[in-house]
Curated annotation (Swiss-Prot):
Part of the 50S ribosomal subunit. Belongs to the universal ribosomal protein uL13 family. It holds the Pfam family Ribosomal_L13. It comes from Acidithiobacillus ferrooxidans (strain ATCC 23270 / DSM 14882 / CIP 104768 / NCIMB 8455). The keyword Ribonucleoprotein applies. This is Large ribosomal subunit protein uL13. GO terms for molecular function: mRNA binding; structural constituent of ribosome.
């Protein structure tokens, strides 16, 4: 008996919608990364994209525990000398709340072309509306 190796074009990704209201950032991100990789499926193959599509709504209502709301800092560099920018979790939540979930999940995916393809299957929106109703996403309890 040979070991089954799934091909990316053979596995179809299902669509799921996740409500991030009052969910803890890390615990939600772990589950999203696992489903984007496809590790919850029996036909999971490390070298193929076997994951699902995930739509996250209400990203502006995400929660963190402890003092992380004040203490957690997000850094990025503009590319110019001396231009390391930083923003706290609270400021990021005010300006770009969807980026909080995106950065957390992106850090949990592989750092290669396959990981970037998996990341494209994640759609994050601040409100409760999303433009993917044609794909009929199923609600996912995390």
């Amino acid at each position: 008996m040979k070991t089954y190796s799934a091909k990316s074009h053979e596995v179809q990704g299902d669509w799921f919608v996740v409500d991030a209201t009052d969910k803890v950032l890390g615990r939600l991100s772990v589950e999203l990364a696992k489903r984007l990789r496809g590790k919850h499926k029996p036909e999971y193959t490390p070298h193929a994209d076997t994951g699902d599509y995930i739509v996250v709504i209400n990203a502006d209502k995400i929660a963190v525990t402890g003092n992380k709301a004040k203490d957690k800092i997000y850094y990025h560099h503009t590319g110019y000398v001396g231009n390391l920018k930083s923003a706290s979790f609270e400021k990021m939540k005010e300006t770009h709340p969807e980026r909080i979930i995106e950065l957390a999940v992106k850090g949990m995916l592989p750092k290669n072309p396959l990981g970037r393809a998996m990341f494209k299957k994640l759609k994050v929106y601040t409100g409760s509306e999303h433009p993917h109703s044609a794909q009929q996403p199923q609600p996912l309890n995390v």
